[in-house]
């Protein structure tokens, strides 16, 4: 048992399958940079409080530098029997520098060590995601600006039934708003997780004269965590990040779903770039939007990670339990999934080919301008609910006759209600309806242009 850091208590080694089941090296080795950073800071703190000599500190820091070089060169001797990244680095350090390496773990447990590593890792991962979100938001802004022309109109839908026409630019900016909130959630999560568990030790703190404020400051944390039990036992910070990732992926999934629908022959609004589609092994004509479909599917994967970790922590007593080892694998996978999805959409969206004429015809159909007629009657003084019934009866008649709203004459309108006058006829044109939706946040070109200019400033494109 000498090769195991905790072997002194045990008379025999673990079962081979149990040892493999217990090991986390396959996924927590991703934290090696954070663990090295933490080790360096912890060593300097131990020296500052008199627990390491200058010579021991120098040896440890040189050893950690050597380990970093080995890992980057791919020559580091990872050993699964040492269970995790922490013990692998410590064991190798001791091999390189001797007894000083064994002193590095003074006043520290793997419990506070892994919690610190994970917070450091998430801090960096969030920064990367925020940069990717900014890049995708810029793409959405550019696409909105490119398609601001009122000729780029598509049907807006409720219940997946044609409802009212909207500008394509308005559609792009709708997803911009969602992604802006997604970025805000990640920023909030980063703010809350940016406290240091280091120094909480196993669960009760330590009797050594450590300086937790020193290590917190050197690792870029706002402050040390105030309760040692909370520091090692809590994973709400990971759940909060997963929740933000889940909501972010839901937004990307909704966008992907719409683009999948719009790219079908039945809709025919858009064509997906060849670089982000695949073919069929049997049907030569097929062009499948696989990347969009996978983004849609992988949203479920991230949701599963959130639900899974919630189930892990829901009944855990304080403080640390081995169950918490199950936090990293789903979290790391969810981060990678969201990261890749953001990158793919940022590359895919500029290559979409929008079919303006097909969109226009679809926006004209489905009686999407019926609300304009109801609003007209309401503006003339008729209670809106009554106006709604008048136009509803008119639409029913047109449906029965197989006619469109634009086919109506003034006489037919007045036959349904005498308040209809000559100025109602322009409302049967798509361009008129679009320009009328000029309320703040509406789809009128001037309203969309106003929001677009604000969005450009928000993402640094002004």
Swiss-Prot record:
Q: Name one Pfam family in it.
A: Lyase_1
Annotated metabolic or biological route of this protein: Amino-acid biosynthesis; L-arginine biosynthesis; L-arginine from L-ornithine and carbamoyl phosphate: step 3/3
Report the GO terms under cellular component. cytosol
UniProt cross-references to SUPFAM superfamilies, sorted A to Z? L-aspartase-like
Q: Which GO terms describe its molecular function?
A: argininosuccinate lyase activity
Per its UniProt record, what InterPro entries does this chain match?
Answer: Arg_succ_lyase_C, Argininosuccinate_lyase, Fumarase/histidase_N, Fumarate_lyase_CS, Fumarate_lyase_fam, Fumarate_lyase_N, L-Aspartase-like
Q: Where in the cell is it found?
A: Cytoplasm
Show the catalytic activity: 2-(N(omega)-L-arginino)succinate = fumarate + L-arginine
Q: What HAMAP family does the record tag this protein with?
A: Arg_succ_lyase
What does the similarity note say?
Belongs to the lyase 1 family. Argininosuccinate lyase subfamily.
Task: Report the protein name in the record.
Answer: Argininosuccinate lyase
Q: Gene of origin?
A: argH
